[in-house]
């Protein structure tokens, strides 16, 4: 059972036991003699029930429906009393509302109806690294700060209406175009005459009294014709230019010719190791690779062969 059902059961037992809580021993339900209680008895029971109910709840939670309380007045006033037992009368009543009525509901708040182009309703935080936003135009500039700004001094563009866009020639650069400060290639240097006092160690002096030779050679004039890679003849490189053969070879040595000969060389399975025991030689080899386990001897050990 949930909490509401337990509360209904507890208060019903409180009515049945004559306004007394259970202390010890089994509960004995007393038979109800009056099938239709009088109005004064119902009012007295309702006051006792209201007092016990108010002691259980917080002051903010003391809210009950109009059908839960009976009108308290003179006995001669008309009070609606249902026919049946008191238990049925209690079960027909509506339980109290278990909520704080002072808290506003979701419908009490007004959501600001703003356009995405005037103010962004998105949260003001991001998860991750925030990249710097560049101010500029373009058909995909909906997420730039200048487009979502609320300032009236910011010009906002309607990309669905405007069709004319400025070309690169309409922009004025901040500085005049200049050559780069770096180059790819050799740097052109010429012979420059310098005073004698400005010579540094590492300079190569020429025969003249006030001239020096740069360490890097002077590049040839660009008008000279140089051969391209496909003008060289590579056919002589494929011929043997020397009368003597090289001192190395990439072939097999003649000493290993017997390895690939067609002679019948026996393989490893052609040898029988056990023939050494039946040999006619006076002595057997010192090491035998045997395949049959010999009987163990106490004087020599299991791993010795004589």
UniProtKB/Swiss-Prot annotation:
InterPro entries xrefs: SHIPPO-rpt
Pfam entry (one): SHIPPO-rpt
Annotated region (Disordered), positions in chain: 210-230
Superkingdom per UniProt: Eukaryota
Entry protein name: Protein STPG3
Native source species: Mus musculus
Gene from which this protein is expressed: Stpg3
